[in-house]
C-alpha cells in the first residue's frame, strides 16, 4: 500500500541512518561510527581519480552529518525540524547552550516573522449552506378520500427553507483583523438577509476586543462589542454587548460567559444572557482522546431545558465518531443519535436522527469540506412513527456503504495513485542521483568488504549471502514491478563488525550504499546470511531495527 510522500522524504538527509546510530546515540557512539566511515571513504585511500572524487563527496557528507549531530544545539534543531530547520535564517543570533524547548520557541518566532509578509494576503473563508427539506408526505399520508386527487399518489418532497452564510477575514496588521460576513435566509417563500462588518484587535497575550456593525432588510442596524480576557491560566471570560435598532425601538442584549478548566480534559461554563431570550446556563464539557461528554442545564425565557450528550471517538484512520444526546425541557423532549466519519483528507460526512415530542422525526445530514459546511435537515414526520425512525437510521447507512464501496473508495484510490505517480515523476531526478551515489558508495566498499569477508570466513562468522531492499511483490504481479527491489548485499556486509550486524530503527534508505527504489511506497529489507556455516533468513520493515545473527532466523533444513 502506498504511503504519503512528504517533502522531507525527498529533501532531507537522514543523518542518523547515514551513520547507522540510534537517535539517542551518545557522543562516543557517534564518534565510533564517524571514524569507521572515515576509514572507508577517506579520499587519500583511493588512487583512481573517479573513485577519489566519489569518496571525497561521501566523506564530506559523513563529516557534515557528524558535525550536526555532535553539536547539542544543531542536533536539537535537526531532531525537531530536520535539515530544513538548519537552513532557517536567523539561527546565527541564537545564544549557544539553549535547551530544545528554547530552540523550538526560537524557531517558531523566526517562522512567524517569515509568515508575516504573507499575512496581508491571507483570508480565512468560512461558509455554511443549509437546505431544509420537508419530506413528511412520505409518512404522514392524507385520508383515503383525498387519494383520488390528481398527482396525490406520489409523495411530495419540498424544500421549505434555505440559509446561506459566508465570512472572510483580512489581517490588517499583526494585531488587527477585519471580518466581513453576510447571510441570506428564506422560509416558505419569505426571506431576508444581512451583512456584518467587524474589526478585531488583539490587545495583549491575555485578551482581544471586537467591534461589530451589521444591517439587514428585516431588522435595523446592529452595533456590537465583544471582549475576551484570560483571568488566570485556567480561567477566562467573554462578554458580548449588542444594540439592535428596529421600528419597535432599541433592543439591548448582553451575554457573559465565564469558563474554568476543572482539570486537563474538563471545562466548566457559566453563561448569563440578558435582553434577547434571557437565560442562565451552566455546562460541563469533558473532552478526551476517545470521548466527548457534555451536561448542561438552562433556566430561561422562553426555553428551559436539561441536556446530556456523549460522543465516542474511534481511533481509526477514518476518525469515526458515534454520538447520542437527550434534551428535555418546557418545549418537549428530543433524543438524537448519529455518527460521522472522515471520507477524504478534508471532508467529514455525518448523519443524525432526531426523535422528539412534539417535533417528530428528522434526519440531519452534514458535510464538512475544509471550512465549508453543508447541512440538510430533513423533516420526515410530525409523529413518532417506528417506520420513519427505522428508515432514517438504516437508509443513510445503506447509502453510505454503497457510495463508499462503489464511488468514494475507487475515486480516492485513483486519486492516490495519480498523486503518487506525479510525486514519483517529480522525484525521478532525485532518485537517479541517489542511485548514482549508492553505486559509487558500493564501489568504494569493495576492498573493505573483501577484507571483512576473509576475516569472517576464517572464524566461520557472519557472511551476507544475499540482501534485497525495496517493495517485494508476489508471483502474480507484473514482472516490471520487480525492479523496485535492489541488491544491498555489499553495503550490509560492509556494516558487519565482529560477526554482528546491527541496524537502528530508521529508514534503511539512508544507509551507505542504499537508496529508495520505490519512493512513497512501503519497503522491506530481506537478508539471507550464513553464520557458523548455517543459513539464516529474516525480513524486516523499513523502519524496524535489525540485529543478526539470531537463532530464530535459522532455516530448518531437516524437514
UniProtKB/Swiss-Prot annotation:
Q: Which residues form a coiled coil?
A: 417-457
Keyword terms: Acetylation, Chaperone, Coiled coil, Membrane, Mitochondrion, Mitochondrion outer membrane, Phosphoprotein
Annotated J domain residues: 14-82
Q: Where in the cell is it found?
A: Mitochondrion
Question: Record keywords: Chaperone included?
Answer: yes
Query: Biological process (GO) annotations?
Result: cristae formation; inner mitochondrial membrane organization
Report the main location listed first in the record. mitochondrion
Q: Which residues carry this modification: N-acetylalanine?
A: 2
Asked whether the UniProt record includes Coiled coil among its keywords, one would answer yes
Q: Which domain of life is it from?
A: Eukaryota
Q: Which CDD domains match?
A: DnaJ
Give residues where Phosphoserine occurs. 204
Its cellular-component GO annotations read: MIB complex; mitochondrial outer membrane; mitochondrion; nuclear speck; nucleoplasm; SAM complex
Family membership noted in the UniProt record:
Belongs to the DNAJC11 family.
Q: Outline the subunit composition.
A: Associates with the mitochondrial contact site and cristae organizing system (MICOS) complex, composed of at least MICOS10/MIC10, CHCHD3/MIC19, CHCHD6/MIC25, APOOL/MIC27, IMMT/MIC60, APOO/MIC23/MIC26 and QIL1/MIC13. This complex was also known under the names MINOS or MitOS complex. The MICOS complex associates with mitochondrial outer membrane proteins SAMM50, MTX1 and MTX2 (together described as components of the mitochondrial outer membrane sorting assembly machinery (SAM) complex) and DNAJC11, mitochondrial inner membrane protein TMEM11 and with HSPA9.
Task: Check the record and name the PANTHER family matching this protein.
Answer: DNAJ HOMOLOG SUBFAMILY C MEMBER 11
- Quote the protein name from its UniProt record: DnaJ homolog subfamily C member 11
Q: Organism source for this protein?
A: Homo sapiens (Human)
Amino acid at each position: 500500500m502506498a504511503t504519503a510522500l512528504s517533502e522531507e522524504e525527498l529533501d532531507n538527509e537522514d543523518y542518523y541512518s547515514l551513520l547507522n546510530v540510534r537517535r539517542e546515540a551518545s557522543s562516543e557512539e557517534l564518534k565510533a561510527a564517524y571514524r569507521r566511515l572515515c576509514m572507508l571513504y577517506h579520499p587519500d585511500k583511493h588512487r583512481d581519480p573517479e573513485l577519489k572524487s566519489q569518496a571525497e563527496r561521501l566523506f564530506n557528507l559523513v563529516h557534515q552529518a557528524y558535525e550536526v549531530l555532535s553539536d547539542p544545539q544543531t542536533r536539537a534543531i535537526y531532531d525537531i525540524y530536520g535539515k530544513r530547520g538548519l537552513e532557517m535564517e536567523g539561527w546565527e543570533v541564537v545564544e549557544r547552550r539553549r535547551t530544545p524547548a528554547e530552540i523550538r520557541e526560537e524557531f517558531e518566532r523566526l517562522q512567524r516573522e517569515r509568515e508575516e509578509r504573507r499575512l496581508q494576503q491571507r483570508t480565512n473563508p468560512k461558509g455554511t449552506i443549509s437546505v431544509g427539506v420537508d419530506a413528511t408526505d412520505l409518512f404522514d399520508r392524507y385520508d383515503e378520500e383525498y387519494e383520488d386527487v390528481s398527482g396525490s399518489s406520489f409523495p411530495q418532497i419540498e424544500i421549505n427553507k434555505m440559509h446561506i452564510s459566508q465570512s472572510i477575514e483580512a489581517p490588517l496588521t499583526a494585531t488587527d483583523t477585519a471580518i466581513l460576513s453576510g447571510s441570506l435566509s428564506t422560509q416558505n417563500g419569505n426571506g431576508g438577509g444581512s451583512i456584518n462588518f467587524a474589526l478585531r484587535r488583539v490587545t495583549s497575550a491575555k485578551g482581544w476586543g471586537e467591534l461589530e456593525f451589521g444591517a439587514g432588510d428585516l431588522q435595523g442596524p446592529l452595533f456590537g462589542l465583544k471582549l475576551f480576557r484570560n483571568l488566570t491560566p485556567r480561567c477566562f471570560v467573554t462578554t458580548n454587548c449588542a444594540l439592535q435598532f428596529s421600528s419597535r425601538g432599541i433592543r439591548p442584549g448582553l451575554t457573559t460567559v465565564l469558563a474554568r478548566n476543572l482539570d486537563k480534559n474538563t471545562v466548566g461554563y457559566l453563561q448569563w444572557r440578558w435582553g434577547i431570550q434571557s437565560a442562565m446556563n451552566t455546562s460541563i464539557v469533558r473532552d478526551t482522546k476517545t470521548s466527548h461528554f457534555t451536561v448542561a442545564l438552562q433556566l430561561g425565557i422562553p426555553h428551559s431545558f436539561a441536556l446530556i450528550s456523549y460522543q465516542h471517538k474511534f481511533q481509526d484512520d477514518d476518525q469515526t465518531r458515534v454520538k447520542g444526546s437527550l434534551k428535555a425541557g418546557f418545549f418537549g423532549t428530543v433524543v438524537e443519535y448519529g455518527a460521522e466519519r472522515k471520507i477524504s483528507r478534508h471532508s467529514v460526512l455525518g448523519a443524525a436522527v432526531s426523535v422528539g415530542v412534539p417535533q417528530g422525526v428528522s434526519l440531519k445530514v452534514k458535510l464538512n469540506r475544509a471550512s465549508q459546511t453543508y447541512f440538510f435537515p430533513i423533516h420526515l414526520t410530525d409523529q413518532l412513527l417506528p417506520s420513519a425512525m427505522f428508515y432514517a437510521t438504516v437508509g443513510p447507512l445503506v447509502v453510505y456503504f454503497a457510495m463508499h464501496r462503489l464511488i468514494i473508495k475507487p475515486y480516492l484510490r485513483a486519486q492516490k495513485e495519480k498523486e503518487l505517480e506525479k510525486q514519483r515523476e517529480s522525484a525521478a531526478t532525485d532518485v537517479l542521483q541517489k542511485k548514482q551515489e549508492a553505486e559509487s558508495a558500493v564501489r568504494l566498499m569493495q576492498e573493505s568488504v573483501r577484507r571483512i569477508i576473509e576475516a569472517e570466513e576464517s572464524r566461520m562468522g557472519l557472511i551476507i549471502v544475499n540482501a534485497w531492499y525495496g517493495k517485494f511483490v508476489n508471483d502474480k504481479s507484473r514482472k516490471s514491478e520487480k525492479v523496485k527491489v535492489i541488491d544491498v548485499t555489499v553495503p550490509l556486509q560492509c556494516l558487519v563488525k565482529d560477526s554482528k550486524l546491527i541496524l537502528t530503527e530508521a529508514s534503511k534508505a539512508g544507509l551507505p550504499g542504499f537508496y529508495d527504489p520505490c519512493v512513497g511506497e512501503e519497503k522491506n529489507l530481506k537478508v539471507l546470511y550464513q553464520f557458523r556455516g548455517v543459513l539464516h533468513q529474516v525480513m524486516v520493515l523499513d523502519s524496524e531495527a535489525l540485529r543478526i545473527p539470531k537463532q530464530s532466523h535459522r532455516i530448518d533444513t531437516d524437514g
